[in-house]
Amino acid sequence: IIQTDENNYRTLGSYLECLQNEQAFPWGKEAVVETPHIDRLAHQGVLFTRCYATSPVSSPSLASFMSGLYSKNNVVWTNEMVLSDAAVTFGESLRQNGYATGYIGKLHLNGKGRPEWHPRRDFGFSDNRYMYNRGHWKKIEETAEGPTFRTDADVKSTDEQTFPTDYFTTQAIEFINRHKEGPFCCMLCFPDPHSANLVRPPYDTMYSRIRFKEPATALTDTTGRPAWSHGNNLKADQHEDMAQYFGMIKCIDDNVGRILDALKGAGILDNTIIIFTSDHGDMCRQHGLINKGVPLDDSSRVPFIISYPAGMRQGIRIENVMSVTDFTPSLLSFCNIRPTTQYDGRDLSLLWKGEKLPEKYKDIVFMRAITPKIKSDWDESTTAMRTKWISAVTPEYKLTYSEYASDVPWLTDLKKDPDELVNCYRDPAYKEIVSRLAADLKEYGEQYNDPRIKHPKIQQEILSAILKK
């Protein structure tokens, strides 16, 4: 399982193939990263065109991915929180069923420790020597006590032995070779392409020739738009940041190639389930924004590719929406492992196999903004943040409500308006759609006890939408 951090899906060739020209090349037609190894996984397996983070920030998204639970039940609703002891990770379930389990790279589920190598709690991964909690430094060195980050190192002094993406890949390959004779699960979490946008030579100059254009969405008037869509600290010149970001993506893809070569060399490539995904996206200047945390697709929509040549059809694109919360129950079902706990996420393993879901299946996912203060319980009453939003997403529509006083509810027709610029909420033609999605949000909030649905403003807007049906 290969997971990146803050990976815009438009940087992967296999996702560009799913998009129309104006959507595929927001930074200009020459602004393309070559990702042949990740694309190979997509062409030999299944690609979900619309997989979403339950909350587009590292810890909450990864917690839901690992546990199959929404934030209310895994108690990780912002960064620097600890995954609930009651949460049974997919790693623990696989370990209990005879798999050798290992975790390599960034965890971000064990509180404030930084970097905190091989934490005492292993989260279901027996080999966690190369697991660390959090941080984005650019050089790793081996010591007698184990790996350590050189926090003062210049990225230009790193190489294929010390740059984190390469280093963690080397450890993953060693894990594969040690356990190739039996069932294993290796979770490899790259800390890139998260900011700061810096990558080692020669990747640091590979894309310097490109003149990145400002995305069209960054040039639009934000008057009347919700607070969560307003710009945030953009540099005047994006060129260097984007060139470095593309370089990080290229470095990741080359290391995915190393992993595929290692699996082939071990004779187990065709019989290994390989998953490529990310915890959340990066706005990359779309809508005049950088980083993540908002419901817009460049922030909340993540790549999700699964390849298993011996056990699934190839070259399949899935248009159904998927949530990272669906991952754990789907993986265990796909591996024929009976769960030992109740999950909030759904079993989508039929889609992984290229089969259809039952007719009664409701094709919808839910997302929410983080809760910005760490508290001992789920009380949000005293926190204030302009981005306290909640969304329902289907393949066709996205409905978002916000606690912020001046924010109007926002409905996007994703098919007609993939740039997410036009609000259809008060358009009479969408009245039935608004009412249905509002009812779905209400049902979700009540079933999973999400307090954001109970906020007076959001509650009133949802009830009003339902009554107008």
Features from the language model and the residues they span:
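Residues forming the ATP-binding cleft of Hanks-type serine/threonine protein kinase domains
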Residues: 415
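Formylglycine-dependent sulfatase
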Residues: 1-403, 407-410, 418-439, 443-446, ...
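A short glycine-rich, hydrophobically flanked beta-strand micro-motif that places a catalytic Asp/Glu
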Residues: 455-456
